[in-house]
Amino acid sequence: LDPKCTLPLETGICRAELHRFGYDTKLKECTQFVYGGCHHNENNFKKLEVCR
């Protein structure tokens, strides 16, 4: 498992509603979440295929 995938899913503090994907360590799979548009970590992908 890539270390960046163990980072928490961060929605960010801004108010955009962008659909992104990140690895959820509890579910052990990539899931979709709403990203606010700023302040994120590396566990934030535009496409599901890139998250895997």
From Swiss-Prot:
Matches recorded under InterPro entries: Kunitz_BPTI, Kunitz_BPTI_sf, Prtase_inh_Kunz-CS, TFPI/VKTCI-like
Keyword set includes Isomerase: no
Residues of the site described as Reactive bond: 15-16
Physiological role: Inhibits trypsin and the toxin protease PR2 of M.anisopliae. Does not inhibit chymotrypsin, subtilisin Carlsberg, proteinase K, porcine pancreatic elastase and the toxin protease PR1 of M.anisopliae.
Entry keyword Cell wall biogenesis/degradation: no
Name this protein carries in UniProt: Inducible serine protease inhibitor 2
Disulfide linkage: 14-38, 30-51
One GO term describing the cellular component: extracellular space
Alphabetized SMART domains for the sequence: KU (SM00131)
Alphabetically ordered keywords of this record: Disulfide bond, Protease inhibitor, Serine protease inhibitor
Induction record: By infection.
GO terms for MF: serine-type endopeptidase inhibitor activity
Residue ranges occupied by any BPTI/Kunitz inhibitor domain in the UniProt entry: 5-52
